[in-house]
Amino acid sequence: GVWFEEEYKRVYPNGSLAADVIGFSRADNEGQYGLEEYYNDVLNGTTGREYGYLNDDANLERTIKPAVDGNTIHSTIDANIQGIVEKYLKQFNEEHKDAVHPGNGAENVGCIIMEVNTGNILAMASYPTYDLNDTRNTDALLGSRKIEMVTNANGYDVLTKTDTYFTQEDIDALTDDELLDNLNYLWKNYCISTTYEPGSTAKPFTVAAALESGAITGNEHYQCNGSLEVGGHTIKCHSYRSGGEGDVSVQDSIAWSCNVALMKIAA
């Protein structure tokens, strides 16, 4: 005889919301990227089975092994805050699209919002992003820089950004491997998978350490002429071209992100 069996799979009712954080599951229900991959064994249940045979009286003898549901996980992401962040990341890119170069307003934009008293992550988003229910939709690549596999000076194959900003014609010309390379770059969580030096985010800690150690009182003022010689190198402030910030208080050094004042504080 013929009978129907239910099939279970994970779906995403909110589409692209928190795509970087959530990740997605493949056709075989294996998680890929994000929470889906990290907690795959927790989220995946056990598939039920039904089998049987016809006995001597031609009656069907059935055996049913019921499915076991996977577990539920709760993240600290606030869907309302996440939605607002994603809205404005997209708005920024639409406003600046094609302004400096063809394509998106920025190659990547990321934003993390944290609850400072607990460390809970309330929102984590980047742009461009994608729909979790349609992960291979190439519309998400439009305006992004093309990624190519190249061999570096050490003989290693590495993914490198080209000077090409995707048009539909560029996407249509990709081989299957090239398309997968570019989709994999899109699917990763930009906020936590791409490394940069901490830069100005370290400045509040420099001032805090100076205050706590007694190296400064907080009432000092520093003169910024736009650059400072340190160890035989000229380190510039963002105000270098305009001749520097001039008189900078400790508070202003953070508010204006003044490199010269911070170097003098750290010294």
Regions found by a protein language model. Give the residues of each.
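Small/polar-residue-rich segments within soluble enzyme cores
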Residues: 1-70, 87, 94
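Soluble periplasmic/extracytoplasmic beta-strand elements of cell-envelope proteins
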Residues: 3-5, 20-24, 74-76, 110-114, ...
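Active-site-proximal helix/loop microenvironment
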Residues: 10, 18, 23, 189, ...
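Active-site SXXK
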Residues: 21, 84-88, 118-119, 195-222, ...
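Sec-exported extracytoplasmic/periplasmic mature domains
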Residues: 26, 44, 86, 90-94, ...
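Soluble non-cytosolic domains of exported or imported proteins
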Residues: 29-33, 67, 75-83, 186, ...
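Short pre-catalytic segments that frame enzyme active sites
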Residues: 63-67, 79, 83-198, 233
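Conserved catalytic neighborhood of penicillin-recognizing serine enzymes
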Residues: 71-72, 117-118, 181-191, 216-219, ...
